[in-house]
Amino acid sequence: MCQIGVDCKTTKNECYLGSSLCLDDIGFIEQIQTTLRNDLCIDVNQMHYAGFSYGGVQGWNIASQAVDGLGFASFYILAAIPFLGNGMPPDEANFSLFHLIGNEDKLMPPNSNYLKRPGLEGHDDIVENKDGMYKPVTTDLLNKYAEKMGDCEDEESWATEFDGIKNFECFERKCQNGKAIVRCNGDFGHHPYDDLDGKNGAEVAPMILDFMLAHPRK
């Protein structure tokens, strides 16, 4: 079984696509959820997803493709943008989103600025990563999710203790039924925690947890 966010080593009879992992990832997560429900006393309204890099891409896939987002109350997606045409919002998004990414991330670029040139000619809404793969502009994708969440307000500054570290800043958009979208960015690459706390996210985690607990499933 593959770890979320870690590439699998496939055999010659297997097919690996960079936009997904090796097995039935959604089915695997569903099985974990079933086991937790059966064996532990958990609050099913406080199930949250967190994924980094390709684990974050998987989060986009779950939010987009799985029935009702597999019941997750929120998705925390770190340094991840889906491949172009993937990860689009479902007809109804009954969950919150927290997205954190670096402006200088070349594997998962939020826009074309890192290229020091415009995006694809005639297609400013398409971003090319360092490997030549195409991705959407982050803010465009989040706007599409906001449309499906319903009655979202305009973005407002969302203060954190990390503000100003390499121009780190966050913005929040409140939506109907207690849902929200928070997006954060700063001038760092594919490993934001290296710059934000230097402790593999140990000091950032409470901020993420507070967001999750404040946005239960409704």
Regions found by a protein language model. Name each.
Residues F98-L100, G132-K218:
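C-terminal catalytic histidine-bearing segment of alpha/beta-hydrolase fold enzymes
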Residues D25-I32, G55-G59, G71-F72, V137-L141, ...:
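Stable alpha-helical elements in mature extracytoplasmic
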Residues F98-I101, M108-P110:
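Conserved hydrophobic ligand-interaction patch in extracellular adhesion modules
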Residues T35-F95, K106:
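Primarily recognizes the serine-hydrolase "nucleophile elbow" in alpha/beta-hydrolase
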Residues L17-F28, Y54, N129-V137, L196-N200:
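Extracytoplasmic/periplasmic, Sec-exported soluble proteins
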Residues M1-H48, N61, D197:
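Serine-hydrolase catalytic machinery in alpha/beta-hydrolase-like enzymes
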Residues K106-P118, D124-V127, M133-V137, Y193:
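Conserved alpha/beta-hydrolase "acid-adjacent" motif
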Residues M1-S20, L115-D131, E155-E172, N177, ...:
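Surface-exposed intrinsically disordered loops and tails
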